[in-house]
């Protein structure tokens, strides 16, 4: 399979569609590092020690499974998550100075197949950058219904005064229940070693 750019910005690049179809290996010519799928690709391959492949979805390993065009999706996974706090101050690692009149927000949404993206809402939170921790105002439990958990994940975007300053991503296939650490990355996919997001995950 080859994917050619629609224009100069390669806007038709979507690795999830390849993975969902069972394509295991792809050569990627990434010309920018500030795209959601670039970070998603990096985090996904990290689970395989950067060997450069993603296993086929589980449904392709079932010989008796027949998928028709209008069948309902299989392997439904219900996930709930509550963000506890962000360890250490996020903004100080971006080199930006905070003013009291400005604010931070974090959005959380599903990055995956079209069915998963369309059936789940995007959550938005206001962040309060404290002396030690970045706290979350009006924290609430987020719930997601996932059809293709093998090739999907959660994307976190942190904005300061409406400017994107940090991102995070966690694939559903490596998500475990309990308190978990989610690494935070810059816009260029460089990991901030001294800060992270702490979340409480549960699978229903």
What are these regions (language model features)?
Residues 1-40, 45-48:
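Catalytic and substrate-binding clefts that recognize carbohydrates or anionic sugar/phosphate headgroups
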Residues 8-14, 63-70, 89-95, 125-129, ...:
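Eukaryotic intrinsically disordered and solvent-exposed regulatory patches
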Residues 37-44, 147-204:
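C2-type phospholipid-binding modules
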Residues 39, 46-65:
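Long, highly charged low-complexity segments enriched in Glu/Asp and Lys/Arg with interspersed Ser/Thr
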Residues 59-112, 143-149, 203:
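C2/C2-like lipid-binding beta-sandwich modules
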Residues 118-133, 170:
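Solvent-exposed serine/threonine-rich low-complexity stretches and specific carbohydrate-binding patches
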Residues 133-147, 169-170:
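Exposed aromatic-hydrophobic patches
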């Amino acid at each position: 399979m080859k994917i050619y750019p629609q224009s100069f910005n390669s806007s038709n690049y979507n690795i999830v569609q390849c993975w969902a179809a069972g394509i295991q290996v792809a050569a990627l010519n990434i010309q920018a590092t500030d795209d959601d799928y670039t970070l998603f690709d990096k985090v996904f391959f990290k689970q395989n020690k950067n060997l450069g492949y993603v296993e086929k979805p589980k449904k392709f390993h079932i010989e008796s499974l027949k998928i028709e065009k209008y069948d309902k999706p299989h392997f439904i996974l219900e996930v709930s998550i509550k963000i506890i706090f962000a360890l250490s101050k996020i903004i100080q690692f971006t080199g930006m100075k905070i003013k009291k009149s400005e604010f931070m927000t974090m959005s959380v949404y599903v990055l995956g197949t079209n069915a998963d993206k369309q059936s789940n809402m995007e959550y938005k939170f206001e962040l309060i950058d404290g002396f030690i921790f970045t706290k979350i105002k009006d924290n609430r439990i987020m719930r997601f219904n996932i059809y293709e958990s093998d090739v999907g994940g959660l994307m976190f975007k942190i904005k300061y005064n409406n400017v994107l300053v940090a991102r995070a991503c966690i694939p559903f296939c490596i998500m475990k229940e309990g308190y978990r650490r989610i690494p935070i990355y810059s816009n260029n996919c460089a990991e901030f070693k001294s800060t992270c997001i702490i979340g409480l995950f549960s699978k229903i």
